[in-house]
Amino acid sequence: VNATTPNNTFERYAFLVKGSHKISDRVDGLEDWRKVSMKPIDLNFRIHTPGFRLWLEQGNFTCFSVRFTEEGVKIICPRNVDFSLPEVQRLVRNAIIRAMKKNAQEYLPPLLSALSEQYHLPFKRVKITGSKGRWGSCSGTGSINLSCYLMLLPPHLMDYVLLHELSHTKEMNHGPRFWELLDSMTGGRARALRAELRGFNTDF
C-alpha cells in the first residue's frame, strides 16, 4: 500500500512558539500504547510506515513550515532551533499530528470503504479524529470515528481496527457473535490481533 499525498507542495504553516448510543472502543489500549516515554524529537526523527512518511530538515526560515511532497511530509526547521526547549517539542509534535491527521483523512476513508464493500458491512459516515485515547469508535447509527494515530500501525493491525469498527455496525457489543464475525474476517485471529495491538509500542 502506498501513501497518498498531494503532488504539489502544500501551503506553508507558520507555528508560533508561544441521538444515538455510542460504542466507545478503546480498541485495545491506545492509552497503554502511549505510556511509552516519548523521546525528544530532533532532526534525526523519522516516521516511515506504509501509510505515512515524515522527516525533519533544517532550513533557512525563521519559523517552522510543513510541506507535503510525493515522498511524504517534510517539516522544515529554523537553522538555529533549540530542540531541548519544551515549547519547541510541543510545537513540532503538534505539527506532526496535524500532518498525520491530514494524511489520515486521505488514506483511511477509502480503505474503510473498500473493507466495507468486501465484507458487506455498510457504514453511514467516517470522521478522522486526533484521539489519543481510542483507536476508533462506532455509533448506533453506523457513524465511525478513526484516530489519525492509526497511520503509525502496520497494515494488518490497521485493517484489524477498521474491521473491528465495521463489525459494530452489525453487532453493537463485544459478545460472542461480535467475535465470531470479526474472526470470520481475520482468519480466526481476532483475539490474537487484539493482543498484538495491545503490545504495539512507539517512541512518538
Q: Where is each model-derived feature located?
A:
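Active-site-proximal or metal-binding-adjacent scaffold patches in catalytic folds
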Residues: 1-159, 169-204
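Walker B catalytic acidic pair
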Residues: 165
